[in-house]
């Protein structure tokens, strides 16, 4: 990026999307990690000297000056590989920014293998006007711009859960951006039909199971269903997924059926809770509990945001929520699995890949149509992951975005990663002890479906005849 482009982009951001400033003394919570909002003031020692060029002796500096100087030093970086200007990061604590940047960020992408449109007459009306217009002359979608934000937010949830499982919560992108485990996770979400959690897989499964036409916006429940089913089909992910029903109830008996095997061993399980916390806005009685959900060490974030515009929320401070925004269109992320990928995934084509030679689409089903220059030779599939730092940088950002809780849409998807039974007990205690009205309810057992009779109830029915009536 040249200087003119960088300056132009900075001017546009300043006027139309200004970066938030660190204007609160409340602690910052990011997926269970607490950060102080201000770095400690600089305290001189007898051996300290004035930094070069300041012209101010240490004894004459105020706490405010030290804090400003520290903030400037924290953000004094060279331009990032993804083209972001470090000046926009403001005076946020560097440890918080490092953690924020380490979260995997999925956005709109363009130029990928086409996803064929549905031939169902209802499909067109299910798309937004913008999506219809930008794909008017195309038989398929080569970009998910305009309809894929909830899918991308769902990918963020799943990708960060897998990253924490493989690298731990304390791994930082800045220290080892090309770590093998990191590249392996990124490859799972490549914009390619062969990637197990690609946009193609989500759209295909949404059409087959959730009644979502290609190009139609997903809701939280459809995203959760796709995550659960796609993970179930890809055992190499090493994860189980539990999805709550129509409400915010988590049933312990059903959860343990998924999380605990026959030997009593607990497997890492992603809990997805789809809920609605109000009509048009989040009801204030839920505010404290929603903030507390991001303070739990099991939190993997929240997918939601505004009507038909989903974000991935990872942090909170006072009544503000910080998020990763998927509404930036970038070139496709190529599929580059490592050599340790399972032979079954490489050798055996999925249903989606097997249908990739077809160009027809009926009802709500979808077909992937590869172009000639996008087909990877079989010999390339098993090569070690070769993502460049520039490609990896498109999946991370230090650019903070913030939204007041009163501006958030009440429909959302909450995510928690439970790695053991002790972890589950800790999480259960946490959701039950929040202030205000809880956003998640843990019940011992799932109630029997309505209309299902209790066993033995028919034997307790007493018959009456006319002679027995008084």
Go through each PLM region and give its residues.
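Cysteine-dependent deubiquitinase/ubiquitin-like isopeptidase catalytic cores across multiple families
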Residues: 2-143, 147, 159-162, 166-470
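Stable alpha-helical elements in mature extracytoplasmic
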Residues: 153-154, 223
């Amino acid at each position: 990026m040249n200087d003119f482009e960088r300056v132009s982009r900075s001017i546009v951001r300043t006027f139309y999307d200004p970066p938030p400033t660190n204007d609160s003394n409340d602690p910052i919570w990011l997926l269970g990690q607490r950060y102080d909002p201000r770095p400690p003031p600089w305290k001189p020692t007898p051996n300290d000297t004035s930094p070069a060029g300041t012209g101010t002796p240490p004894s004459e500096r105020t706490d405010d000056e030290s804090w400003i100087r520290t903030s400037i030093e924290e953000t004094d970086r060279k331009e990032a590989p993804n083209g972001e200007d470090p000046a926009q990061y403001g005076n946020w604590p560097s440890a918080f920014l490092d953690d924020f940047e380490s979260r995997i960020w999925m956005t709109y992408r363009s130029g990928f293998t086409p996803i064929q449109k549905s031939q169902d007459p209802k499909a067109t009306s299910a798309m937004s006007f913008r999506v219809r217009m930008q794909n008017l002359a195309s038989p398929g979608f080569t970009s998910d711009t305009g309809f894929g934000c909830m899918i991308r937010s769902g990918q963020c949830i799943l990708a960060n859960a897998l990253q924490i499982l493989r690298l731990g919560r304390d791994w930082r992108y800045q220290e080892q951006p090309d770590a093998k485990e990191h590249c392996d996770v990124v490859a799972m979400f490549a914009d390619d039909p062969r990637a197990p959690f690609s946009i193609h897989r989500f759209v295909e499964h949404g059409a087959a199971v959730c009644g979502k036409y290609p190009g139609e916006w997903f809701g939280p429940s459809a995203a959760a269903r796709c995550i659960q089913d796609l993970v179930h089909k890809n055992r190499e992910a090493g994860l189980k997924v539990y999805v709550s029903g129509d409400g915010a109830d988590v049933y312990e008996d059903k959860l343990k059926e998924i999380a605990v095997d026959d030997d009593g061993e607990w497997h890492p399980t992603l809990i997805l809770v789809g809920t609605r916390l109000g009509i048009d806005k989040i009801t204030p009685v839920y505010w404290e509990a929603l903030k507390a959900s991001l303070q739990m060490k099991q939190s993997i974030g929240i997918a939601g945001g505004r009507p038909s515009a989903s974000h991935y929320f990872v942090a909170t401070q006072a009544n503000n929520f910080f998020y990763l925004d998927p509404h930036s269109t970038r070139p496709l992320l190529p599929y580059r699995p490592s050599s340790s990928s399972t032979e079954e995934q490489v050798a055996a084509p999925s249903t989606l890949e097997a249908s990739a030679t077809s160009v027809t689409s009926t009802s709500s089903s979808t077909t992937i149509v590869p172009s000639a220059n996008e087909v990877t030779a079989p010999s390339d599939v098993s090569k070690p992951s070769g993502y460049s730092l520039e490609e990896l940088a498109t999946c991370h950002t230090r650019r903070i975005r913030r939204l007041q809780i009163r501006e958030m849409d009440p429909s959302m998807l909450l995510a928690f990663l439970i790695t053991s039974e002790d972890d589950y007990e800790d999480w259960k205690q946490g959701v039950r002890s929040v202030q205000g009205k809880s956003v998640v309810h843990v019940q011992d057992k799932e109630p029997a479906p309505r209309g299902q009779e209790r066993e033995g109830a028919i034997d307790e029915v007493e018959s009456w005849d006319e002679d027995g009536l008084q």
